[in-house]
Amino acid sequence: MTVETDKQTLGFQTEVKQLLQLMIHSLYSNKEIFLRELVSNAADAADKLRFEALVKPELLEGSGELRIRVDYDKDARTVTIDDNGIGMSREDAVSHLGTIAKSGTADFLKHLSGDQKKDANLIGQFGVGFYSAFIVADQVDVYSRRAGLPASEGVHWSSRGEGEFEIASVDKPERGTRIVLHLKEGEESFADGWTLRGILKKYSDHIGLPIEMRKEHYGEAADKPAEPEWEAVNRASALWTRPKSEIKDEEYQEFYKHVAHDAGNPLAWSHNKVEGKLEYTSLLFVPGRAPFDLYHRDSAKGLKLYVQRVFIMDQAEQFLPLYLRFIKGVVDSSDLSLNVSREILQSGPVVDSMKSALTKRSLDMLEKLAKDKPDDYATFWRNFGQALKEGPAEDYANREKIAGLLRFSSTHDTTGAQSVGLADYVGRLADGQDKLYYLTGESYAQIKDSPHLEVFRKKGIEVLLLTDRIDEWLMSYLTEFDGKSFVDVARGDLDLGKLDSEEDKKAQEEVAKSKEGLASRIKAALGDDVAELRVSHRLTDSPAILAIGQGDLGLQMRQLLEASGQAVPESKPVFEFNPTHPLIEKLDAEQDMDRFGDLSRVLFDQAALAAGDSLKDPAAYVRRLNKLLLELSA
């Protein structure tokens, strides 16, 4: 029996206690996933040993043959997962098995929805896969020794998943980690060779090192060898090194789940081998849903980097631009050195060339998804659309390609769904239309009936409706598409070009001239709150509207700056009025200057509200409105 020393009983971190209760009582509907998670962790431990052994070959301790072994004991009701990877020290065991970084568990708990299937999918993504052992086990024992430490510095960690764990020092001659699961009553079916082989084949066939189980011997006991014979139950070859023609969709899907720590299937993938001046293989995936921290600055992003099939690092961010941070996968290069570091990856012709090619490959994959599977692309857009909208600012070379992948709401579709591509929009341009019109706002509901759209509805011209907070910033970089300029319909003096006939333009000029006196009176009433007064060519039904000055920030950008605590440049709107509206005609006829001032102010405030802005002095607006209502009801 192994002698234990320095035994301690320690409590789990609070969040881990909550997590264990969820695991044990409610979370997994698909219990067999525990084996996938533990085998995946064992494979990561082997990768880490390979990487550290590049600099310190003595860590291999004379045995470089890495493997994972899965065993079971029907009588004892146990399942054992054993690896000879990097292993853990006592401090590692307390740190990794007794606590989880706050960004992991706390956020995991916050994102639980109560839907077992959805919640189970979160496990690997949040790095809490080890605790899935408690779904089928009422006790878990972990024996481990970190490579490079003496045999006497092994560690035994044990817990029943009830809020605390024991840890002790033990002798462990072999490096690596052995996890023994003591199965609960009713979970004995997992202590079976065929069951375990089936699960491993299903979830772990792609793992790049052998997963071994004892050979099954049927017949007389005398025929069984004295020492157990082990055989690999998986292919044990890196999936990306195999020819595409030999790989089934299901294998790609399971590999994705391993590299992305995601239990759902990817929407698309692209597997390519590049030969010639540069040699590398890439396998890229588009996930089916966004991680919880997609927009966190320190979120996990980047590809797994291998050099000549040796794992080098997770989250190599240098091979894809930030706006494609959701792409998962691996890149295996023959042109980088085995001792490559993150610093070396920061720049250089090899990395730059690979980044350019992988970016194009990713965008091609999205184009194909949009063309061949529009429903799946709609799912992609709901999850990652706002990240892709960062592209035109970050990647000038691919701006037009990215623009073609963007989706917006528009006046063409009354559902408000972001389903309109720019190519679709260009294909529906009205005769004589040489500009692409858009309007930004907080929500589809807020801008779908905006007064700014009135003239476009009258003429049957489609307008894009941009409602994401990033959109106004996006349009400052995306100035044209397919050779046609974008025009914000709420900005400047609207010129419809050929969409207005010469007769229309002449009539507009005459009306504007005839209303110069009224414009001067309204300007005097509104004072410095407006930059300019003019007759509107935008309005057909509303009395007035506020337009944004040509060089001024729009409402979205002002709100973004305010929210981030930055100074907002001062700007004043342009007040446009509809000379044919009955309210404006009554205003023109009003001789009482106080009443004229009140009416002008109410129209100004209503125009601000219609534009989605807030009032500087809502109490004054209500007071004036009440005064006018009293006069009307007298």
Curated annotation (Swiss-Prot):
Keyword terms: ATP-binding, Chaperone, Cytoplasm, Nucleotide-binding, Stress response
SMART domains: HATPase_c
Entry's localization field: Cytoplasm
Sequence segments annotated as region (A): 1-342
PROSITE patterns in the cross-refs: HSP90
Annotated spans, C: 560-634
GO molecular function, one term: ATP hydrolysis activity
InterPro entries the record matches: HATPase_C_sf, Heat_shock_protein_90_CS, HSP90_C, Hsp90_fam, Hsp90_N, Ribosomal_Su5_D2-typ_SF
Spans annotated as B: 343-559
GO cellular component term of the entry, any: cytoplasm
Subunit structure: Homodimer.
PANTHER family xrefs: HEAT SHOCK PROTEIN 90 FAMILY MEMBER
Function of the molecule: Molecular chaperone. Has ATPase activity.
Similarity comment: family membership: Belongs to the heat shock protein 90 family.
Protein name in the entry: Chaperone protein HtpG
Species per Swiss-Prot/TrEMBL record: Xanthomonas axonopodis pv. citri (strain 306)
Gene giving rise to this polypeptide: htpG
